Amino acid sequence: MGSGPIDPKELLKGLDSFLTRDGEVKSVDGISKIFSLMKEARKMVSRCTYLNIILQTRAPEVLVKFIDVGGYKLLNNWLTYSKTTNNIPLLQQILLTLQHLPLTVDHLKQNNTAKLVKQLSKSSEDEELRKLASVLVSDWMAVIRSQSSTQPAEKDKKKRKEEGKSRTTLPERPLTEVKAETRAEEAPEKKKEKPKSLRTTAPSHAKFRSTGLELDTPSLVPVKKNSSTVVVSDKYNLKPIPLKRQSATAAPGDAAPPAEKKYKPLNTAPNTTKEIKVKIIPPQPMEGLGFLDALNSAPVPGIKIKKKKKVLSPTAAKPSPFEGKTSTEQSTAKPSSPEPAPPAEPMDTDRPGTPVPPVEVPELMDAASSEPGALDAKPVDSPGDPNQLTRKGRKRKTVTWPEEGKLREYFYFELDETERVNVNKIKDFGEAAKREILSDRHAFETARRLSHDNMEEKVPWVCPRPLVLPSPLVIPGSNSQERYIQAEREKGILQELFLNKESPHEPDPEPYEPIPPKLIPLDEECAMDETPYVETLEPGGSGGSPDGAGGSKLPPVLANLMGSMGAGKSPQGPGGGGINVQEILTSIMGSPNSHPSEELLKQPDYSDKLKQMLVPHGLLGPGPVANGFPPGGPGGPKGMQHFPPGPGGPMPGPHGGPGGPVGPRLLGPPPPSRGGDPFWDGPGDPMRGGPMRGGPGPAPGPYHRGRGGRGGNEPPPPPPFRGARGGRSGGGPPNGRGGPGGGGMVGGGGHRPHEGPGGSMGSGHRSHDGPGGNMGSGHRSHDGPGGNMGGSGGHRSHEGPGHGGPHGHRPHDVPSHRGHDHRGPPPHEHRGHDGHGGGGHRGHDGGHSHGGDMSNRPVCRHFMMKGNCRYENNCAFYHPGVNGPPLP
């Protein structure tokens, strides 16, 4: 209607031509026009008006016309809308109208109106609405029950007609013909009515339920049915498709017409199934097992019937009667009895009949019944048949259940058109295939597009037009006081300058010199103690030093100094009258406990004495530091072992034996062996860092092996300025003992020694001596074959096994000897070499991994900028004037 408010009186005036004085619709034509107006109604007033008009209409033909035109569907739409909007008055009006309409089961199955009404009867908040809905539901249930009960009667009539036709061949034909004629008149009406009901009742659970409710005693039936079952099977074999129906009808019908009447209802169920699929369904529950088979077997009923007979004969044919088959769920009581055969017959009849359209059903039924009727009449016994028929009629209302093993469960879900559809379920595979093709095409196009994508702009860039903006109406900050405050503030602070380059290019590269990574050895050899090692000396050696334990009393300055001296020794050579470092230290220190470290620095001649010590060793000059240990390195204050100055200090041997006279032990522990024997004594070993020393007596045992480096057959180690170690010469064994004609090599300073075969090496500079000549520290001796090198004033001697040899020379008559280095000032420091009763000798590794001439390394930036480097002598770079000659 119009969008404005609607006056119901005006609406009724407009409809006056279609309505009577009482508001009832006059004719069928008027109801169709009113329905067309109802479809357009959107307002609640107009809808209620139309509903009242329908309520006032009493003529059944008008109401039926209203339903046929689509009024029932329209009411369903209005009911759904009013239920969603919870419009109670409109819901009540619609329910009253539905109650007034003559609805059938077919109408109720068309949509979900019945479902909505049932929901309202249970869940509605309004009590009156609930009552009204429950009344409507009960009314509809009554309609459903009445229709389900009427259907079997109609089936009976049809069966009787069929039997009459079939008995035209039999002598009893006249009785059946009369019945058939009487029912033939009723048939057309039933046919008209049935098409609707048949369609709606396709799954007809209503009938199934009604039959289930009507249970009767099944005991008598089995005995009489046995004979009928046998006959049926015979008939089936003769004519499989038609015989089955005929057998069902003929077995009971031949005996007597009244029996036929009772029996026909059972057969009518299959007939109805044949006529219309919908009708077939209601009786099928009784036929239980054959229902689905009948639907499936429609195209080839004969073949399927035979198969089913086989199945029924072993399982249900003998024990299951009519009801047993029809109710797959029902035949528990009668499985033992041979009744199952008759149910097989109706099942078979239903199966062939299901495919037949409703219009053709009567003709097909008649033909089928006539043919099997003749066959059935012969085998059926007249006396037993009438009883069976009557009982069968009764049994029609009885329910029997098969044995547990024969029970089958079927689920049938009827889809309501108005129900929600599962979207995920593929209904049309064609559509799914199209979607798949489209998705594949899309994926292919995107892949092709991406493969040719150069990440370049396809559209040329154009400079946008400049925007012409009107001058601002207000100058921003014109009245602001904060800008003046900020200006005053900026006068007293530094201006923030950001010197960003105007170009987007990378900044200029900073000068950078790659620094080799610092090597941090993981061995305990290089672990630096927090405090310098202090060795307590035991008295009892030959000749005690005047300072006693003075080595442990060195102040930090001297400790660093001695660390920098490295392998420097007092230059007391065979012909040298150099400065005695030991005496200078003694004069500086005085008595061991006389002065604290601070007072030593205040002595007037302190610096002069230090210069005297350092100048000969090149520590203050441009020359390289010989085997300089960094202050913090293993040879410095933290890692260096301080030995008391002065000759002959008693020293405990490494094995606990009495020590011989010792010289100043000012050298730190050697670096980790490189290529030789990795074993070396811990920081507590008094042998570490000093010359080989020990008493003239036999050594405790071969505990110490000669320290070996690389000898004549092996190339020297690659790193620059690593003190060469005593090594194998002449292919000596890897533990550092010289081979035949080779002497042990003593590690020296920075320069690589030049040796003859088996020559020994010292530290520092090179000096060429004669064969067997000795070398002081800081000099290189070039020995002849088997040449020897000693420490400062130390001599290497080699004697026969087990005895000490003379000092100052090494006999050449011993072809194979061990190399050992004696650096102590007195010539007594010789430990017998490995021999009979002789202790093992250790060749000393001179040199350190750091220190020496590093002028071939890059210059240390920190040292050049600040004048010092925090790594000091540990630094891996060149410090001019410290670990190499000063820059020119």
Swiss-Prot record:
Q: Where is the composition biased (Polar residues)?
A: 325-334, 583-595
* CDD domains listed in its UniProt record: TFIIS_I (cd00183)
Which SMART domains does this chain map to? TFS2N, ZnF_C3H1
Stretches the record annotates as Necessary for interaction with PPP1CC: 393-408
The zinc fingers classed as C3H1-type run over 854-882
Question: Compositionally biased, Basic and acidic residues: which spans?
Answer: 153-166, 174-196, 596-611, 811-851
Single GO molecular function: protein phosphatase 1 binding
Residues carrying Phosphoserine: S313, S382, S545, S591
The protein's name in its UniProt record: Serine/threonine-protein phosphatase 1 regulatory subunit 10
